[in-house]
C-alpha cells in the first residue's frame, strides 16, 4: 500500500488500526489539501492519503471508521470552490495518485467503453481515447482538467448536455468504495441503488475509484459558430428552439453567455470573436441595445466514414439552421477546428489566467440551474441589474433538458423540462490593485441567491454550499428523504465528504437528518 497517514492521525485510531502501513508527515501535501480553487475556505487535514488502488481507499476508510472522529474526503484536481473536498482534521484521499491505467472494453454487443480511474482527468481520457482508439465519450465539461470521479459526483455539464445528457447520464458502470470500507461494482442492472446514489451524490455515499464510460467514433472536425443578440427574449427563444430539435436537425453543442456592451477586454465584446483577431463591429448593434448583450455559441461535428456528407454538407446544415435565428446580422463569427482543439479551448483561458495571476486568486463562483419559466425575470433582475458591469469572467447562460437526466440519480434539478445553467465565473484580479474585495463578491452571490428565493424562482444551486440541514432539505426537496436513507445505508457513520456540510460525524448524525425530512 501507498498510504501516507500522519503519525498523529494513525495514533488517533483504535489499537487494531496498527495493521495499517507505516505513516509519514507530508506537510506540503496537507497544505495543498487545505485549499481549493475557490480560495475562500481553508481546512487542514490530519493526513493526506495517496492510494495506489481501490483497496488502499477502502483501507483508509476502514481506518477512519475505527476511530471516533476521523472523516474522509476524496480530492481530485482541487477545483472545488467552497471547501467541498476538504476534511478538517480528517483524511484527504489524493485521487490523482491512483494509477492512470485506462482500458478499452468491448462488450459482446460491440459497444465500446473506456474503463478509467476515478482520479483521471477528462483531458487524459480525451487524448487516450482519440489518439489510441479514434473514439470519444459523448458528454464533456467545458474545462477538461477535472477528474472523472469529481464530475460524476456532481453532474458534469456542458454544451453537449441538451443532446447527449450530462456526464452522469453517460456512464455504464462504477467501482465505488462505500463508507463501510467495502468495494462495490455497480451499474443500472447490478446494485442500481448505489449506482444512482453516487451519481450526483456529492461524495456522500462512496468514493468513485473507477468508471466505465461509453465511447463512439470521435468526430474529426468541428464547425464552431458564435452569433450576437441584443434582445434576451430572442436569444432565449432561439436557444430553446435549438435544444429541442430532433437529432437529425440539431447541433452537437449549444451554449451561450452574456457580456457587457463595451470594449472591456474581460467583460465586453472582445470576448466574442472567433478566430482570434476577428473584428466585432459594434456599429451593427441596434440603437436600443441595453447594457448587456448575449452570445449564442453552437457547434456541429463532422465524423469520418462519409456519414456527414463532407464539409459542403456540414456548411449547408449549419447555414440552414442559422438562417432561422434572430441574431444581429453581421455579428456572426465562425471557425473550423479539430475536435480535440475544440474541447480543449478553455486551456487558453487557464494559460492566460496563470500568466496574469488571477488563477491563483480567489474564485467566488456561483452556478445555478434556473427554470425557463423564470430565466427572463432573472435576466432583468440580475444580469441587467446587479451584474450589468460584468463579473470579471464569463457569465454563461444556456438551456438544457431535464428529460436527459435520470431522476434516480442524486442530482437536484428545477421542476421545468427546460432549465438554464447560469454560471458566474469570477476571476478576481490579483493584488495589488485588484477588483472589489472578495467578501463583497461573496455577499453579491448571496444576494443573487436571496433574489431567486424571494422571487419564487424555480431554481437549484449547482455545486451547492449550505451549512444547515434545513437548507439541504429545501435543496433536495422531494429527494431529501431518499438522500438521507441512502446515507444511512452506505455511510452510516457519516465518514465521507465532510466538507459538503450535510452530515456531521456524530453517533446521531444521520438520525438527526431524518428529523428534518420534508
UniProtKB/Swiss-Prot annotation:
Residue numbers bearing the Pros-8alpha-FAD histidine modification: 79
InterPro entries: Cytok_DH_C_sf, Cytokinin_DH_FAD/cytokin-bd, FAD-bd_PCMH, FAD-bd_PCMH-like_sf, FAD-bd_PCMH_sub1, FAD-bd_PCMH_sub2, FAD-linked_Oxase-like_C, FAD-linked_Oxidoreductases_BP
Enzyme class: oxidoreductase
Induction (free text): Strongly induced by abscisic acid (ABA) and leaf senescence.
SUPFAM superfamilies noted in UniProt: FAD-binding/transporter-associated domain-like, FAD-linked oxidases, C-terminal domain
Family under the similarity heading: Belongs to the oxygen-dependent FAD-linked oxidoreductase family.
Name of the protein in its database record: Cytokinin dehydrogenase 11
Amino acid at each position: 500500500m501507498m498510504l501516507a497517514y500522519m503519525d498523529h492521525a494513525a495514533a488517533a485510531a483504535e489499537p487494531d488500526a496498527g495493521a495499517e502501513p507505516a505513516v509519514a508527515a507530508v506537510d506540503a501535501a496537507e497544505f495543498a489539501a487545505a485549499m481549493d480553487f475557490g480560495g475562500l475556505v481553508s481546512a487542514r487535514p490530519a493526513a493526506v492519503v495517496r492510494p495506489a488502488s481501490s483497496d488502499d481507499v477502502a483501507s483508509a476508510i476502514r481506518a477512519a471508521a475505527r476511530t471516533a472522529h476521523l472523516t474522509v474526503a476524496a480530492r481530485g484536481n482541487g477545483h472545488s470552490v467552497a471547501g467541498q473536498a476538504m476534511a478538517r482534521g480528517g483524511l484527504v484521499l489524493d485521487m490523482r495518485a491512483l494509477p492512470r491505467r485506462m482500458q478499452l472494453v468491448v462488450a459482446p454487443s460491440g459497444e465500446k467503453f473506456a474503463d478509467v480511474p476515478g482520479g483521471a482527468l477528462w483531458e487524459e481520457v480525451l487524448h487516450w481515447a482519440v489518439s489510441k482508439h479514434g473514439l470519444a465519450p459523448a458528454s464533456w465539461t467545458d474545462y477538461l482538467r477535472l477528474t472523472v470521479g469529481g464530475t460524476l459526483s456532481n453532474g458534469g455539464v456542458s454544451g453537449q448536455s441538451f443532446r447527449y445528457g450530462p456526464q452522469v447520464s453517460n456512464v455504464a458502470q462504477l467501482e465505488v468504495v462505500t463508507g463501510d470500507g467495502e468495494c462495490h461494482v455497480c451499474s443500472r442492472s447490478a446494485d442500481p441503488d448505489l449506482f444512482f446514489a453516487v451519481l450526483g451524490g456529492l461524495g456522500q455515499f462512496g468514493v468513485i475509484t473507477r468508471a466505465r464510460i461509453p465511447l463512439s467514433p470521435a468526430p474529426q472536425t468541428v464547425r464552431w459558430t458564435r452569433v450576437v443578440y441584443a434582445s434576451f427574449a430572442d436569444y432565449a427563444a432561439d436557444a430553446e428552439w435549438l435544444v429541442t430539435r430532433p437529432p437529425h436537425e440539431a447541433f452537437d453543442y449549444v451554449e451561450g453567455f452574456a457580456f457587457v456592451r463595451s470594449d472591456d477586454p474581460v467583460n465586453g465584446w472582445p470576448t466574442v470573436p472567433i478566430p482570434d483577431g476577428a473584428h466585432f463591429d459594434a456599429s451593427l448593434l441596434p440603437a436600443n441595445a441595453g447594457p448587456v448583450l448575449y452570445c449564442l455559441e453552437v457547434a456541429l461535428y463532422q465524423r469520418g466514414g462519409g456519414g456527414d456528407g463532407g464539409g459542403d454538407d456540414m456548411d449547408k446544415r449549419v447555414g440552414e439552421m442559422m438562417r432561422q435565428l434572430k441574431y444581429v446580422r453581421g455579428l456572426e463569427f465562425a471557425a473550423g477546428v479539430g475536435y480535440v482543439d475544440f474541447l480543449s479551448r478553455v486551456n487558453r483561458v487557464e494559460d492566460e489566467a496563470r500568466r496574469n495571476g488571477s488563477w491563483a486568486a480567489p474564485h467566488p463562483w456561483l452556478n445555478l440551474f434556473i427554470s425557463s419559466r423564470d430565466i427572463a425575470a432573472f435576466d432583468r433582475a440580475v444580469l441587467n441589474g446587479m451584474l450589468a458591469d460584468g463579473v470579471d469572467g464569463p457569465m454563461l447562460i444556456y438551456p438544457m433538458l431535464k428529460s436527459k437526466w435520470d431522476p434516480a440519480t442524486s442530482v437536484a434539478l428545477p421542476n421545468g423540462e427546460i432549465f438554464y445553467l447560469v454560471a458566474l465565473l469570477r476571476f478576481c484580479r490579483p493584488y495589488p490593485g485588484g477588483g472589489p474585495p472578495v467578501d463583497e463578491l461573496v455577499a453579491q452571490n448571496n444576494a443573487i441567491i436571496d433574489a431567486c428565493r424571494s422571487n419564487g424562482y424555480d431554481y437549484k444551486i449547482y455545486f451547492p454550499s449550505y451549512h444547515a440541514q434545513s437548507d439541504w432539505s429545501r435543496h433536495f426537496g422531494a429527494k431529501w428523504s431518499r438522500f438521507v436513507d441512502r446515507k444511512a445505508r452506505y455511510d452510516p457513520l457519516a465518514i465521507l465528504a465532510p466538507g459538503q456540510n450535510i452530515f456531521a460525524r456524530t453517533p446521531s448524525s444521520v438520525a438527526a437528518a431524518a428529523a428534518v425530512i420534508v
